[in-house]
């Protein structure tokens, strides 16, 4: 009998690691990402918990590497869960990389894992609350529809360059980030029917602010910014990575078998608090 395999991109990160620990209770884990040293550290933690795990160095922006990851995972057993958390933000890198990793990388992941996902499998792509901060324009939709075209990346790059403050690279990167995360929701929903033909599900999660090591740096280095951010969250606190692990595990379970083609906004009420007048 083949073992059950769960692939987690970005599994060495705060939320990714929590997801690995939760799903690792019933499945072997394949950690995928660019930083092999961090993945091996995460693997050591999983080993201590008795979780069977593997590491596969992968740049998700590289189609060939993602294809190799999918083939490797399939060689280990039945690929039942693919959790794609990898991504970059404006504070990490430039506009070009945001589009290449977040948008093109998601296309690569879906296209590579659709053929190997076993019957009854689930794929979850991670978007962000940032996807809800800007409306999807007709120009964005037209660019999104070109996801399979050779100039897809270039189209998104052009749209990011049309930011009002073109002199600010950070502003361009911020626009590219919101656009790339909105694309993740769009592309996830665009794949629902074909995944259903295999009796598989595909959905997305949009996290708000979670107390990951990266977010802790913001709190430590920019306390005023963090305080202002916290004031926007009706829950009055940051999310905890273990909560994301539990949510992801539920969405992968049979009990969530009718949850499909939807984005789960897990932001402590932040989006509603900002955009809907409160009582």
Predicted regions, residues:
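Conserved glycine-rich cofactor-binding loop
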Residues: 12-13
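Conserved glycine-rich Rossmann-like NAD(P)H-binding loop of the short-chain dehydrogenase/reductase
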Residues: 27-41
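Rossmann-fold cofactor-recognition segment
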Residues: 46-64
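Conserved NAD(P)H cofactor-binding loop of Rossmann-fold oxidoreductase domains
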Residues: 83-90, 269
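Catalytic loop of short-chain dehydrogenase/reductase
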Residues: 90-92, 122-197, 209
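Short, small/polar-rich loop/turn modules that mediate ligand/substrate recognition or access, typified
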Residues: 201, 259-261
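A conserved structural motif in NAD(P)-dependent oxidoreductases
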Residues: 233-244
């Amino acid at each position: 009998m083949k073992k059950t395999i769960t692939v987690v991109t970005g599994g060495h990160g705060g939320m990714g690691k929590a997801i690995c620990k939760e799903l690792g209770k019933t499945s072997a884990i394949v950690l995928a990402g660019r930083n092999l040293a961090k993945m091996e550290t995460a693997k050591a933690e999983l080993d201590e918990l008795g979780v069977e795990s593997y590491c596969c160095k992968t740049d998700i922006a590289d189609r060939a590497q993602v294809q190799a990851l999918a083939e490797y995972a399939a060689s280990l057993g039945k690929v039942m869960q693919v959790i794609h958390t990898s991504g970059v933000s404006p504070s990490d890198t430039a506009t070009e990389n945001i589009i290449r990793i977040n948008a093109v990388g998601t296309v690569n992941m879906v296209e590579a894992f659709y053929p190997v996902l076993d019957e009854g499998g689930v794929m979850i792509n991670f978007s962000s609350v940032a996807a809800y901060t800007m409306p999807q324009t007709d120009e964005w939709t037209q660019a999104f529809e070109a996801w399979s075209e050779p100039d897809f990346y270039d189209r998104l790059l052009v749209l990011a360059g049309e930011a009002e403050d073109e002199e600010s690279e950070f502003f361009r990167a911020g626009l590219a980030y919101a656009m790339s995360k909105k694309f993740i929701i769009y592309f996830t929903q665009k794949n629902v029917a074909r995944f259903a033909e295999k009796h598989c599900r595909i959905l997305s999660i949009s996290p708000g602010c979670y107390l990951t090591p990266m977010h802790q740096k913001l709190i430590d280095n920019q306390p005023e910014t963090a305080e202002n951010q916290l004031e926007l969250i009706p829950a009055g606190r940051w999310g905890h990575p273990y909560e994301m692990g539990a949510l992801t595990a539920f969405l992968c379970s049979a009990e969530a078998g009718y949850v499909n083609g939807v984005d789960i906004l897990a932001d402590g009420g932040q989006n509603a608090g900002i955009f809907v007048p409160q009582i």
